[in-house]
């Protein structure tokens, strides 16, 4: 059955396709045949959604009316075979936590070769990258039958994004590897969020502007990791505000005016005392406010779906990269054995499709414009 709810309202747009040349020829032909007929032309022009000027309406008084080309609707996403795709948009979503690349694999470092292998395995298993913001807003644009995955990188290490002496992107840094992979597999995407502390992002002062522009142009985001990588547990509310607000202010100076620093990865996974935790969500620094829409833990398991009744944007679990127990490789092995646990998209960003047996677990409160389909 269909229930209305959801986060964004989407409007279907019809495009009008008219041939100006055909209209003019038809008009001239009608005038030449019926000299006594008059033509009343409306001179008002309008613009279509793609910026093209729509030719004026032409009204010809003649025994035979001028036929206008039929309106053509934008093709809709074809409906899926639910018995084949078996969408489950209450399944688990991995938010993967990386840090830097290194010469050997550790709990916080991944070799370039292993990172490439991670991307390849994710792709082959049907995962496709999704922006963190889209996840928390319920804007799941993942194709039908595939699973969204969110890639995150903490600390802004130079191995995340490095320029060589000739100012080309190092093919063995994270962004270089992702760029090359996306060229070969464009449907995988390049969506990822990089979380920064104070100091020079990616440790190359003269290239910060280029790097940030490149990231934003290619679907990557910038997030907050606190100014000094503070331990939040002993801090007061004022100290937490300073750590987050100061870093947000510094990052915004390097970004377009309308870009929001509203994504937070908790350093060390720590939170302040119970009464101070509201400052993780919002606060201000020297009169400049900040407000986070996603707060990430240093987790050890996948996140629940954003449509799950237990989802909490202020406490999103992450999967640690690596090959050990409860790290990325371990979880991928688990999904290979139990694929039904994964979030499986129905291919419709304006709809949430779930097996009817899970109806008690869904909660679309706060998501406007979405439809719920149970099957």
For the regions a protein language model found, what residue spans apply to each?
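C-terminal active-site subregion of NodB/CE4 polysaccharide deacetylases
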Residues: 55-152, 163-165, 169, 234-375
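C-terminal motif of bacterial Sec signal peptides marking the signal peptidase cleavage site
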Residues: 34-36
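Substrate-binding clefts and substrate-entry loops adjacent to catalytic sites
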Residues: 223-234
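Acidic (Asp/Glu)-rich catalytic clusters
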Residues: 142, 179-189, 203-223, 305-311
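A short alpha/beta connector and helix-capping loop motif
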Residues: 162-183, 191-194
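Bacterial signal peptide processing site
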Residues: 38-40
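Bacterial N-terminal signal peptides
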Residues: 24-32
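N-terminal secretory signal peptides that target proteins for export/translocation
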Residues: 1-16
């Amino acid at each position: 059955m269909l229930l209305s709810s959801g986060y964004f309202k989407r409007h279907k747009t019809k495009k009008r396709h008219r041939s100006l040349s055909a209209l003019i020829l038809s008009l001239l032909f009608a005038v030449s045949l019926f000299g006594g007929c008059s033509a009343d032309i409306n001179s008002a022009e309008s613009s279509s959604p793609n910026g093209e000027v729509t030719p004026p309406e032409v009204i010809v008084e003649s025994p035979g009316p001028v036929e206008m080309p039929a309106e053509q609707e934008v093709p809709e996403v074809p409906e899926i075979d639910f018995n084949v795709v078996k969408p489950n948009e209450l399944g688990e979503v991995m938010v993967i936590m990386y840090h830097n690349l290194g010469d050997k694999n550790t709990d916080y470092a991944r070799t370039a070769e292993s990172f490439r292998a991670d991307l390849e395995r994710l792709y082959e298993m049907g995962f496709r990258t999704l922006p963190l913001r889209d996840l928390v807003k319920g804007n799941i644009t993942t194709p039908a039958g595939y699973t969204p995955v969110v890639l995150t990188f903490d600390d802004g290490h130079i191995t995340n994004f490095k320029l060589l002496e000739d100012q080309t992107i190092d093919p063995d840094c994270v962004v270089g590897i992702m760029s090359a992979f996306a060229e070969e597999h464009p449907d995988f995407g390049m969506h990822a969020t990089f979380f920064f502390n104070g100091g020079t992002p990616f440790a190359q002062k003269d290239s910060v502007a280029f790097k940030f522009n490149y990231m934003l142009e290619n679907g990557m985001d910038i997030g907050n990791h606190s100014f000094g990588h503070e331990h939040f547990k002993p801090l007061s509310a004022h100290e937490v505000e300073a750590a987050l607000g100061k870093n947000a202010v510094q990052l915004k100076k390097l970004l377009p005016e309308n870009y929001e620093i509203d994504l937070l990865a908790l350093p060390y996974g720590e939170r302040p005392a119970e009464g101070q935790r509201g400052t993780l969500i919002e606060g201000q620094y020297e009169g400049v406010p900040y407000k986070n829409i996603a707060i990430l833990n240093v987790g050890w398991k996948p996140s629940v779906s954003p449509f799950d009744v237990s989802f909490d944007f202020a406490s999103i679990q992450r999967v640690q990269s690596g090959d050990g127990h409860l790290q990325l490789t371990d979880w991928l092995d688990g999904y290979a054995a139990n694929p039904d646990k994964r979030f499986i998209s129905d291919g419709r960003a304006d709809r949430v499709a779930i097996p009817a047996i899970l109806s008690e677990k869904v909660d679309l409160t706060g998501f406007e414009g979405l439809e719920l389909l149970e099957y």
